[in-house]
Amino acid sequence: VLTDDDKNHVRAIWGHVSNNPEAFGAEALYRLFTAHPASKTYFSHFDLHENSAQIRXXXXKVVDALTQAVNNLDDLSGAISKLSDLHAEK
């Protein structure tokens, strides 16, 4: 359970990320691929080269979804239920 202070810290830090979702999201995805190369199998239909438009677009969507979660820290399950349902059906 997050305290109000914890939530404020998360919001402050996330503010920097949400200002440039494509760049931060792509960087996170490339780091995932470096640390866990097997994760690339989930993106086999993507162009995985650096600065790939597909990676940047997918990563921006992830950051946007996480931004919604950060904006709704008091109701995380409600904030991300649509995204959860989408991924459960795929």
UniProtKB/Swiss-Prot annotation:
PROSITE patterns: GLOBIN (PS01033). Residues 1-90 form the Globin domain. Keywords: Heme, Iron, Metal-binding, Oxygen transport, Transport. GO terms for cellular component: blood microparticle; haptoglobin-hemoglobin complex; hemoglobin complex. One of its GO terms (molecular function) is peroxidase activity. GO terms for biological process: hydrogen peroxide catabolic process. It comes from the Eukaryota. Red blood cells. The keyword Heme applies. Signal peptide: none annotated. Pfam families: Globin. Gene3D superfamilies: Globins. Heterotetramer of two alpha chains and two beta chains. Belongs to the globin family. Involved in oxygen transport from the lung to the various peripheral tissues. This is Hemoglobin subunit alpha-1. It comes from Saara hardwickii.
